[in-house]
Amino acid sequence: MVDVAIENGHALVTIDNPPVNPLSVSVRQGLMDAVRRVNEAKCETAAIVCAGRTFVAGGDISEFAGPPPLPHLPDVLDAIEASPTPFIAVMHGTVLGGGLELALACAWRIADEKTRFGLPEVNLGLIPGAGGTQRLPRVIGLERAARMAANGKPVNTKTFEEFGGLDLVFSGDPTQALAAFRAALPARPVNTSDRSVENADLTALKAEIAKSAKGADAPMIALETTALAATLPFAEGSKIERQTHLELRASAQSRALRRLFFASRSVTRPDRLKAFTPAAINHVVIVGGGLMGAGIAAASLAAGHRVTILERDTESAEAGRGRVEAIIAKDLESGRITESKAEARRASLSAGANYAAAFDADIAIEAVFEDPEVKRAVFAELAAVMSETALIATNTSYLDPNLISEGMPGPGRFLGLHFFSPANIMKLVEVVGTSATADQSMATAFAFARGLGKIPVETGVCDGFIGNRILSAYRRQADYMVADGASPYEVDKAMRKLGMPLGPYELQDRTGLQISWANRKRQLAAGTWPGRYVDI
């Protein structure tokens, strides 16, 4: 997993641990051996590169459940930093967590112009554990480092270079960039751990993190640990960081977040579907240009698809187009996309009222009103013009996809794809197979959702599937509290205090009351209402 090649007094240390080159125990041991070989050879420089699509993207999370095996990462990084041979980190892809800690232990850092850098440990209920909170402020300053450690968000190459974190930015061949850097090698800088840190007022940042953490412990701990770099020697600060990191590994929050991390990856590729090659998706049709349909359309455009919005009349279709263009404009205004990307998305969007426009679509998703007969009518229109190999999906929140697709030609292509609003932002997509849905169709649907940057989860046919089934129980208990005398404002406040980003009534106000109201009426009429009826 770690190869060392020495030529003309220069060493090339290559990490090859696909898919994201995590710092597993074998990689750590390989790096220790590499340092020893480089020292013995008295190399002039040693460069660390990674095979594949990225530099080291973190530690091996699977090791976090038990005692960390030797060698420990802090010891590896200390050995790299203390080596008589200066190391150069040659980076591309994502340099995250232990990967950034590795780079910070090197004398110099050079990176491809499209690289991203971050300390995302807080997203797993942790803080860095190999000097990240102590070395980073010694390179880019205390406030910037504290922000990166506490919010867990990566920064791009341009930003990290402006922070002072890079010695060279390159585009193209990293081998040529490394050769050019070595040819004009600057004097070796002071080791990162030996640098001082200027103190900074973190009061505003603490208030910001306290507000955004919403009950999570790790963000504030990461900030406070990073702040130690301004008052303690590196060795003392690193010792506290390591001890805190190990304590957090055993915390309930971190265990839960790590479980979620692994679960959210395993569910996106069901084992039984791995034998199927997903069909290519080029043209996406969305029937219904309301809030949900516009969000799905925007997500599809962002993924590079051609999108057509179909509505009941031209006026409604143009209104749907306007909603999608508003999302594109907001992304442009916020800097998430460039003008050229915005224009490309607008050019890939069309809208109309003629179902004939769906004749060459690879997938159509209906996002119309939550009424089974309305949805069946849409399915019939789509089935009449689309290829029998194209997917036809319902975005229903509660209804049985079997009933919506019953009697339609080509039953193997029908399924449910339930997005959550706003669909251009929310990650979860429930993939609901009918009794007749083909595994090939399911494989294509999963691949399509992954391509949108979503987390697709297979669910069986039941009222509300997974997300709304949970939400219904949550909302039902909230309604009982209101019926017993609490106000909706009090319920919302209590849930926000618990850590929810929104209370149940705020959430309903934002997403709309129609679907919930229609569902309660449907359940009451069918005699399936699961509790006492609340007339609000």
Model-derived regions, located:
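Long, basic N-terminal domains or extensions that often function
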Residues: 100
